[in-house]
Amino acid sequence: MLAQKQKLSPISVNQKIDYKDIDLLKLFITEQGKILPRRATGVTVQQQRQIAKAIKRARVLSLLPFVASNSI
């Protein structure tokens, strides 16, 4: 059985996750605008919930796009 290496979270445990911090939220979405899963980012369950809620709020307020634009 192989031991999996735990990924380091890009945010600290005590760091406040805010919907206005677009630079932080962009670390947790793909180029297509999808929210990255917890196993890919290495955050805790509580942090993942806060991140998802903040991204959804930022989308509603037009701070983040719902989907990426297709620029050819």
UniProtKB/Swiss-Prot annotation:
GO terms for biological process: translation. GO terms for cellular component: chloroplast; mitochondrial small ribosomal subunit. Keywords: Chloroplast, Plastid, Ribonucleoprotein, Ribosomal protein, RNA-binding, rRNA-binding. It holds the Pfam family Ribosomal_S18. It comes from the Eukaryota. It is found in: Plastid, Chloroplast. SUPFAM superfamilies: Ribosomal protein S18 (SSF46911). The keyword Signal does not apply. One of its GO terms (molecular function) is structural constituent of ribosome. The keyword Magnesium does not apply. Its main location: plastid. Part of the 30S ribosomal subunit. Belongs to the bacterial ribosomal protein bS18 family. This is Small ribosomal subunit protein bS18c. It comes from Trieres chinensis (Marine centric diatom). The lineage of its organism: Eukaryota, Sar, Stramenopiles, Ochrophyta, Bacillariophyta. The gene is rps18.
